[in-house]
Each structure stands twice: as C-alpha cells, then as structure tokens.
Design a protein with these regions (language model features):
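Extreme N-terminal starter segment of soluble prokaryotic enzymes
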Residues: 1-5
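Short hydrophobic segments within beta-strands
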Residues: 6-7, 54
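Cofactor-binding loop segments of dinucleotide-utilizing enzymes, especially the Rossmann-like FAD-
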Residues: 7-9, 34, 92, 174
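Short N-terminal binding/cap micro-motifs at the start of the first secondary-structure element
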Residues: 12-17
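Flexible gly/pro-rich beta->alpha loop and the following alpha-helix that scaffold active-site loops
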Residues: 20-88
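Catalytic nucleophile loop
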Residues: 79-104
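Pocket-forming structural segment of enzyme catalytic cores
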Residues: 99-181
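Acyltransferase
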Residues: 178-230
Length: 230
C-alpha cells in the first residue's frame, strides 16, 4: 500500500473528488499544511511514495504574490524528480512542477474560469485522457513547462492544460476533482477573489456530474502513469 505526501496551500482546496478514487485503490495520502504549521514543508523523508502539490487560490509563483513556501517546495519537488518518485501538480502545484523540471511560470491575474480542454494525442495519460473534458481553473499565474515536457492537453486558448514531465510526473492547470464547494470556500477564505464569480459558480454546479464522469478515466490514467498501483 503506497502513501502520497500532499502539500496543501489553502484551507479550502484539497484533493476533492480524487480522495475517493485514491481510497478505493487503497492508496493512502497525508496532508501537509505549511500555512498552518509556520511554513513547515515536508523534508525528503516525508515524501513517502510520491508527492502531490495542490492549488493555491490567489497564491502564485511568478513574483506577484508568491506562495511563501515556494522555494522550499521547488527544492522538494526536485528531490522527488531526481529520485524517481511520482509527482502530481495541480494549479499552483503544476507551476511548481514546471519550475522544478527546468521550465518557468508567467504572471497572470487571479482567474476563475470554467471551460473545456482537449487532448493532444490519443495515447495521452496512457490512453485514458478523454478527448475533451471540463477544465476548472482557480488561481494566479501560468506554468510554462520545459521543452522536454509533453503537452497532453490544451485549453481553448492553446495553453497547456495537462503536461507530463519524464515518465511519472504530471501537471494539471485545473483541478480535475474540484467541487463547487471548494471554489466557494476559496472565495470566502481570502480577501482577494474573482470580480464576479456567480455565473461561473452556476456553470460549475451544472458541470459537476460531467467532472465526476471525466475523472473516472483521468484517474485511471494518473494511477497508471504515476505507477501508483505497482
């Protein structure tokens, strides 16, 4: 039975729908919350069998409003990559993965968007990534993966939505297992928020079943690519 270290950047955003999929496969996860523990980030010994980096709400990585533990998390992610441990980055976590792998991030205002992503190849996520799937982004800044990364899906503007680094590291710009309640709590948690979230929240609620349905093959692909059941 494997255990994943999950770095949480806000009280509101957690694994969401991914929790049930992991528990159903007997994959354990342990949350680390640097924002609640004086900025304490797990050390290499705390990586267990893999690393998950979650989104950050209004926190980013491109210099405007960086998450306070950015440098430590980049270093930790590099340790995971260098030792061959699987890494899953979501939102801000995907930005941290991009930097740790030799890419960069670009500044972008805090956004809350509900749209659709399209895969770039039929074999993306070991063939399990749907051709089109809901893309819910709540965050600041954008990852620019290294040239060696493979872009698995793009958003409607052609930007990376899902990318793979090496054989067992994945970045998602949106949260594939998000819930409307997560976004609602993010809006309440911070003074900074999207200007008019009502329309996108309503759309997110109507798409909840589609998100759940898309997550079934997506999670199968994540588990396979990251070798979480091996």
């Amino acid at each position: 039975m494997k255990t994943l270290a999950v770095v949480q950047h806000t009280s509101a955003e957690y694994l969401g729908l991914l929790e049930d999929h992991l528990e159903g496969r007997r994959i354990r996860f342990r949350y680390a919350r640097p924002f609640a523990t004086g900025g304490r980030v797990p050390g290499p010994d705390g990586l267990h069998d893999g690393l998950v980096l979650l989104g950050g709400g209004p926190w980013g990585s491109a210099g405007v409003r960086d998450v306070p533990t950015l440098a430590q998390e980049i270093a930790l992610t590099r340790v995971a990559l260098d030792t061959g441990l699987p890494v899953l980055g979501i939102g801000l976590g995907a930005q941290i993965l991009a930097i740790a792998a030799g890419g960069r991030t670009s500044p972008s205002p805090l956004e809350f968007s509900v749209s659709e992503a399209e895969r770039t190849a039929a074999d993306a996520l070991a063939g399990y990534l749907p051709q089109r799937f809901p893309l819910v982004v709540y965050g600041r800044d954008r990852p620019e993966p290294p040239e060696t990364a493979r872009i698995l899906a793009r958003d409607h503007e052609g930007r990376p939505a899902v990318f793979q680094v090496g054989t067992n590291a994945l970045g998602f710009t949106g949260h594939p297992g998000t819930k409307a309640a997560i976004v609602e709590d993010l809006i309440m948690e911070f003074e900074e928020g999207p200007a008019d979230p009502a329309a996108n929240l309503a759309r997110l609620r109507t798409l909840q079943r589609s998100i759940e349905d898309a997550l079934v093959p997506i999670m199968t692909g994540i588990v396979k690519v990251l070798a979480l059941m091996d």
